[in-house]
Amino acid sequence: MSDINATRLPIWGIGCNPSVGDEVTALLTSGEA
């Protein structure tokens, strides 16, 4: 269980935390641009 949770933690973190999602989006945008 702990391994599965650890693997899905980043995904759930981005989905639950708008601020984190914004940071990731900014990084992806700047990286692609």
UniProtKB/Swiss-Prot annotation:
There is a cross-link at W12-C16 (2'-cysteinyl-6'-hydroxytryptophan sulfoxide (Trp-Cys)). The modification (3R,4S)-4-hydroxyisoleucine is found at I11. The modification 4-hydroxyproline is found at P18. Processed by the macrocyclase-peptidase enzyme POPB to yield a toxic cyclic decapeptide. POPB first removes 10 residues from the N-terminus. Conformational trapping of the remaining peptide forces the enzyme to release this intermediate rather than proceed to macrocyclization. The enzyme rebinds the remaining peptide in a different conformation and catalyzes macrocyclization of the N-terminal 8 residues. There is a cross-link at I11-P18 (Cyclopeptide (Ile-Pro)). Coiled coil: none annotated. GO terms for molecular function: toxin activity. Residues 1-10, 19-33 form a propeptide. The modification (3R,4R)-4,5-dihydroxyisoleucine is found at I11. InterPro entries: Amanitin/phalloidin. Keywords: Hydroxylation, Thioether bond, Toxin. The typical symptoms of amatoxin poisoning are gastro-intestinal distress beginning 6-12 hours after ingestion, a remission phase lasting 12-24 hours, and progressive loss of liver function culminating in death within 3-5 days. One of the few effective treatments is liver transplantation. Major toxin belonging to the bicyclic octapeptides amatoxins that acts by binding non-competitively to RNA polymerase II and greatly slowing the elongation of transcripts from target promoters. This is Alpha-amanitin proprotein. It comes from Amanita fuliginea. The gene is AMA.
